[in-house]
């Protein structure tokens, strides 16, 4: 039995659904939200790589590197906001983000 494109796509769909569920169930903790968004991006990347492999086109794999770059920048900015929020309010609750308005 070999692993087919359907296996990769179903795994990607399960990871994506898990991240969406994580976002909807926990909307208070900023760290969990960032992890769920990263899991969502990785599920999309898995689908891109699977399609790229099975279609023989390298464009999907190149696009994954761009997504990883944007995801790294998003994580850095999100963690910087988290540090500022924790220093000012001693909490990582998303509801406290309006306190950072200047």
From Swiss-Prot:
Cysteines paired by S-S bonds: none
Listed Pfam families: Oxidored_q2
Transmembrane segments: 5-25, 31-51, 62-82
Protein's cellular compartments: Cell inner membrane
Enzyme Commission number(s) of this protein: 7.1.1.-
Principal subcellular localisation of the protein: membrane
GO molecular function, one term: quinone binding
GO cellular component, one term: plasma membrane
Top-level enzyme category: translocase
Reactions this protein catalyses: a quinone + NADH + 5 H(+)(in) = a quinol + NAD(+) + 4 H(+)(out)
Swiss-Prot/TrEMBL GO biological process terms: ATP synthesis coupled electron transport
Record membrane topology: Multi-pass membrane protein
PANTHER family: NADH DEHYDROGENASE SUBUNIT 4L-RELATED, NADH-UBIQUINONE OXIDOREDUCTASE SUBUNIT ND4L
NCBIfam families reported for this sequence: PRK05715.1-2, PRK05715.1-3, PRK05715.1-5
Family listed: Belongs to the complex I subunit 4L family.
Assembly behavior: NDH-1 is composed of 14 different subunits. Subunits NuoA, H, J, K, L, M, N constitute the membrane sector of the complex.
Protein name as annotated: NADH-quinone oxidoreductase subunit K
Lineage start: Bacteria, Pseudomonadati, Pseudomonadota, Betaproteobacteria, Burkholderiales
Gene: nuoK
């Amino acid at each position: 039995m070999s692993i087919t494109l359907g296996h990769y796509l179903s795994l990607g769909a399960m990871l994506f659904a898990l991240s969406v569920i994580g976002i909807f169930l926990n909307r208070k903790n900023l760290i969990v939200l960032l992890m769920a968004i990263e899991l969502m991006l990785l599920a999309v990347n898995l689908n891109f790589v699977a399609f790229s492999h099975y279609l023989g086109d390298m464009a999907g794999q190149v696009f994954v590197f761009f997504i990883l770059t944007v995801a790294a920048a998003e994580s850095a900015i999100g963690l910087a906001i988290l540090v500022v929020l924790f220093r000012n309010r001693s909490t990582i609750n998303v509801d406290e983000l309006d306190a950072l308005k200047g």
